[in-house]
Amino acid sequence: MCNKLFAGRRGYFLGFVASFGLVGLALFLQQKYNLEPCPLCISQRIAFMALGILFLLAALHNPGRVGRKVYGLLHVIAAATGIGIAARHIWIQANPDKVMAECGAGFDYIMETFPLKKALDLIFKGTGECSAIDWTLFGLTIPQLSLIAFVGLGLFAVLLAFHKKA
């Protein structure tokens, strides 16, 4: 069973579905609970989409032994980026007194108004809205759940990279 799951394109396609499924879940929660995503939330979604696109490219390419390792490295880099963003978001939520108390500018405004380097700096500093905890599942916040998902997808990518092709 596991061999078939990880064989060739199936494993990569599963990673693609999981990545974009998580983005879909985030959009569903946003609509259902009228949540306004902060810049770090949007950055995490972008990281999930990047990871998903890499999984889709690998599924379409169906790489050999060396290619699986290259894709594995790219997947791990994308997952590590997501882990870093989620970890920063968790820190901001745990230390709301260390960030701005008021809500800052939205993601779109920041990206349209500032040069890329300055925009990224502002996004990763976090804003007051990044410290808000609007929804939890089993006592875990959305960034904590995202961190778990990024770690899981990163480990899954490593497993795919070293799995023998059927």
From Swiss-Prot:
Transmembrane segments: 12-28, 47-63, 70-87, 145-163
Keywords: Cell inner membrane, Cell membrane, Chaperone, Disulfide bond, Electron transport, Membrane, Oxidoreductase, Redox-active center, Transmembrane, Transmembrane helix, Transport
Single GO MF descriptor: protein-disulfide reductase activity
GO cellular component: plasma membrane
Family per similarity comment: Belongs to the DsbB family.
Residues in the Cytoplasmic compartment per record: 1-11, 64-69, 164-166
Gene designation per UniProt: dsbB
Membrane association type: Multi-pass membrane protein
SUPFAM superfamilies: DsbB-like (SSF158442)
Pfam families, per database record: DsbB
Positions of disulphide bridges: C38-C41, C103-C130
GO term, biological process aspect, one: protein folding
Name by which UniProt lists this protein: Disulfide bond formation protein B
Periplasmic topological intervals: 29-46, 88-144
Subcellular location: Cell inner membrane
Job description of the protein: Required for disulfide bond formation in some periplasmic proteins. Acts by oxidizing the DsbA protein.
Regions annotated as coiled coil: none
